Design a protein with these regions (language model features):
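Short, non-transmembrane alpha-helical segments in secretory-pathway proteins
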Residues: 24-51
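Short Pro/Gly-enriched beta-strand edge/turn motifs at strand-loop
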Residues: 39-40, 81-88, 129-131
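Structured segments of extracytoplasmic/periplasmic soluble domains
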Residues: 40-44, 74-75, 107-110
Length: 136
């Protein structure tokens, strides 16, 4: 399953495939991308960003574009609890995942959020390459 999420699924969906000459991500870029996505996920959940940590599972960069999939966690590294968010009931019913997917674009030295899916139970990012004219 992890292989499917990390490689096969994004390739099949046209999001940052291996053949697209993905660039190496430096530790500083990784930190900036994850920080930007964390802030955006916290806004989406209407939470203080200090209550949330994203644990990257996949991070691909091509030119000025980055695609991140990460697990939602507490700052202590525990599974994220949607209590206190508008998704709590859905999470209790199993209708929300602990996944976050984000598409970002570099503008100058900053990574800016283009699109995000917090807690998707389907492939929410399927159309992002087309919708946002991102590399496929």
């Amino acid at each position: 399953m992890k292989l499917l999420m990390n490689w096969a699924l994004p390739i099949a969906l046209g999001v940052m495939p291996v053949a697209a000459a993905a660039a190496a991500v430096t530790p500083a870029e990784r930190a900036a991308i994850v920080a930007s996505a964390t802030q955006a996920a916290a806004r989406e959940l209407k939470l203080d960003a200090a209550r949330l940590r994203l644990m990257p599972e996949q991070l691909k960069r091509q030119s000025d574009w980055a695609f991140l999939t990460a697990k939602l966690q507490t700052p202590a590294g525990q599974r994220f609890d949607y209590a206190g968010t508008d998704r709590h009931e859905a999470a209790q019913a199993g209708a929300v995942s602990d996944l976050c997917a984000a598409l970002l674009r570099r503008e100058g030295a900053a990574w800016k959020l283009v699109d995000i899916a917090v807690g998707p139970t389907d492939v929410a990012w399927e159309a992002w390459a087309t919708t946002h004219k991102a590399p496929a």
